[in-house]
Amino acid sequence: MISGIWKETVGSYHASYSTYELVQMFKGKVVITPDNRGSSATVESGDMFVFESDFKGSWKIEENVTKYFCFVL
């Protein structure tokens, strides 16, 4: 298991996960769009969610983000 605090400013990037990730949003707002499946989800301060180990998709950070993350290896 690896955990920590991650901060990022407004912008966009593509993400590809090879392990599960637990996320708790402390600050900010992000629109997450999976590649080739499902619809976008907007997450913001107070939300907690899990990325599956095969997730691939884009992050559109609309407000600066501070999140807690925990990768399950």
Model-derived features with residue positions:
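Conserved short histidine dyad/triad with adjacent acidic residue
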Residues: 1-17, 43, 50-54
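Conserved beta-strand segments that form the floor/walls of ligand-binding pockets within enzyme
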Residues: 7, 31, 50, 60, ...
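Short strand-coil-strand connectors
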Residues: 9, 33-37, 62
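Ligand-binding loop in jelly-roll beta-barrel domains
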Residues: 44, 53-73
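A short beta-strand-loop-beta hairpin characteristic of the jelly-roll/cupin
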Residues: 16-45
